[in-house]
């Protein structure tokens, strides 16, 4: 052990001696400083030793490798948006109201101007519907006559029950205020004439019935007389036959008495037959007497029903004509501003369903109506975010609008340039573009491009998709 320690100490001392001697001559061992051109005249191996290779290529290589690694990591982790681009235009939402006439009319008065603010119910235009006023007056006149006819038949109906003519008194209604005295007299005359005609017919039937009853009384009296005569002649005939049996009188006297009895019996049968006939005639006369009243009553009730139906139809017709006149005064359906005013000439003619102006509500918003190509429609859903770029204002300077997909048409439409496309509506959050402190209002009809965000994908997937597509297609055999 002692020997090992001694050897180790000598070893350390030896290294110390060598290091100290070397340290003393360290400057002598340094390579002499030479200029660059001096190194070029040295032997090749010495030149290589004196001028080592620069580290710049190595650093550049390290930098490129690091950049590639970072780019690969970012391409795997980073993602980009998948958007479907659709061209379209700005449109007003369905809350904007188009003002149209219901029929051909003449412009009577223009109340509003372009851009003017209006409140709900304000008058916008006054039109004159062709023939509306004349139709209203005609219907009012016909309706008044129908109501007067109704009163006439109501009075006649009551007169049948009372058997006398009630006093004519018009109801206290607004539409009877303008009835003239001549019209009242004419109506009274018609009522009296019809009532008198019915009374005369009834009187004639009553006279006929009384006549038949008088004839019946006469026949009854004769029947009573011949019943007595027949009874007396029958008694005498029995007496004569008794005397003939006793041979107290001649047979000729019995035959003569028998002839008298037969004549009396025949007369009695004739008058009884006449009584049956007169009874039948009296019954028929009674029916005719009642029929006169019943026919008159049925006629009055039928006329009353027809008049009531006519009043209902004329009332509906009058309401329609009044609605036509009311519709000729066009009012604002909502509060907002007048836009796209197309009527400027009083006395001009407007046609049915022609748009006269548009009332844009105060809180109305814009929408984008865009055409999405068939290849993109499968990835678009309601609620997806979208960016709207207005063609008239470059988005790099004025920005863009933000919106969401509101509705997707489920049926394709044919476009001459794009083929089969789908109509998509995108709601817009703002109605103007902002640049600094300036707001630029947008209007309906401006061309826009809608970029609808349909999803996300990694950058590496985006870069490799062309290669993947090429490889996939190249491995197929035709």
Curated annotation (Swiss-Prot):
How is this protein annotated for GO cellular component? plasma membrane
Is Chloroplast included in the keywords of this UniProt record? Answer: no
Q: Where in the cell is it found?
A: Cell inner membrane
Q: Which residues lie on this side of the membrane: Periplasmic?
A: 81-478
Q: Which residues lie on this side of the membrane: Cytoplasmic?
A: 1-59
Membrane-related topology note: Single-pass type II membrane protein
UniProt record, GO biological process? killing of cells of another organism; protein secretion by the type I secretion system
Q: Does the keyword Cell inner membrane apply?
A: yes
Q: Which InterPro entries match?
A: MFP, Secretion_HlyD_CS, T1SS_HlyD
Indicate the transmembrane segments per the record: 60-80
Gene3D superfamilies assigned:
2.40.30.170
Superkingdom assignment: Bacteria
Q: Which UniProt keywords apply?
A: Cell inner membrane, Cell membrane, Cytolysis, Hemolysis, Membrane, Signal-anchor, Transmembrane, Transmembrane helix, Transport
The protein's job, in short, is:
Involved in the transport of hemolysin A.
Q: Can you tell me which family this protein belongs to? A: Belongs to the membrane fusion protein (MFP) (TC 8.A.1) family.
- What is the recorded name of this protein? Hemolysin secretion protein D, chromosomal
Q: Give the species.
A: Escherichia coli
Q: Write the lineage as a comma-separated list.
A: Bacteria, Pseudomonadati, Pseudomonadota, Gammaproteobacteria, Enterobacterales
Q: Which gene encodes it?
A: hlyD
């Amino acid at each position: 052990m002692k020997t090992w320690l001694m050897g180790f100490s000598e070893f350390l001392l030896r290294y110390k001696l060598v290091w100290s001697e070397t340290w003393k001559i360290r400057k002598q061992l340094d390579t002499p400083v030479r200029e660059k051109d001096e190194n070029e005249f040295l032997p090749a191996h010495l030149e290589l030793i004196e001028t080592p290779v620069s580290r710049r290529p190595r650093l550049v290589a390290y930098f490129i490798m690091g950049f590639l690694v970072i780019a690969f990591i970012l391409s795997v982790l980073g993602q980009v948006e998948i958007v479907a681009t659709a061209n379209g235009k700005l449109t007003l939402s369905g809350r904007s109201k188009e003002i149209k006439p219901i029929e051909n009319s003449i412009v009577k008065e223009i109340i509003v101007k372009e851009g003017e603010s209006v409140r709900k119910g304000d008058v916008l235009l006054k039109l004159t519907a062709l023939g509306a006023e004349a139709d209203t007056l005609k219907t009012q006149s016909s309706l008044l006559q129908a109501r007067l006819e109704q009163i006439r038949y109501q009075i006649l109906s009551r007169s049948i029950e009372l058997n006398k003519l009630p006093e004519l008194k018009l109801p206290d209604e607004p539409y009877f205020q303008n009835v003239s005295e001549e019209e009242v007299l004419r109506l009274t005359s018609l009522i009296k004439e019809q009532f008198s005609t019915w009374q005369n017919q009834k009187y004639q039937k009553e006279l006929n019935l009384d006549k038949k009853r008088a004839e019946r009384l006469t026949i009854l009296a004769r029947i009573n007389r011949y019943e007595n005569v027949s009874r007396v002649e029958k008694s005498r005939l029995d007496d004569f036959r008794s005397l003939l049996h006793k041979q107290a009188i001649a047979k000729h006297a019995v035959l003569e008495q028998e002839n008298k009895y037969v004549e009396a019996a025949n007369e009695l049968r004739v008058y009884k037959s006449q009584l049956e006939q007169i009874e039948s005639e009296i019954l028929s006369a009674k029916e005719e007497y009642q029929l006169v009243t019943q026919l008159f009553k049925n006629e009055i009730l039928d006329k009353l029903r027809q008049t009531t139906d006519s009043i209902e139809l004329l009332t509906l017709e009058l309401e329609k004509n009044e609605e036509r006149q009311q519709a000729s005064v066009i009012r604002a359906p909502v509060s907002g501003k007048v836009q796209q005013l197309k009527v400027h000439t009083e006395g001009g003619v407007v046609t049915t369903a022609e748009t006269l102006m548009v009332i844009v509500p105060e809180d109305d918003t814009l929408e984008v109506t865009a055409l999405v190509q068939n290849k993109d429609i499968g990835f678009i859903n309601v609620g997806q975010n979208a960016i709207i770029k207005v063609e008239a204002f470059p988005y790099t300077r004025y920005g863009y609008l933000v919106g969401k997909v509101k509705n997707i048409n489920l049926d394709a439409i044919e476009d001459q340039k794009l083929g089969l496309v789908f109509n998509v509506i995108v709601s817009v959050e703002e109605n103007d573009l902002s640049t600094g402190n300036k707001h630029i209002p947008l209007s309906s009809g401006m061309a826009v491009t809608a970029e609808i965000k349909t999803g996300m994908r990694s950058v590496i997937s985006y870069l490799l998709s062309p290669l993947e597509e090429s490889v996939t297609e190249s491995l197929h055999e035709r």
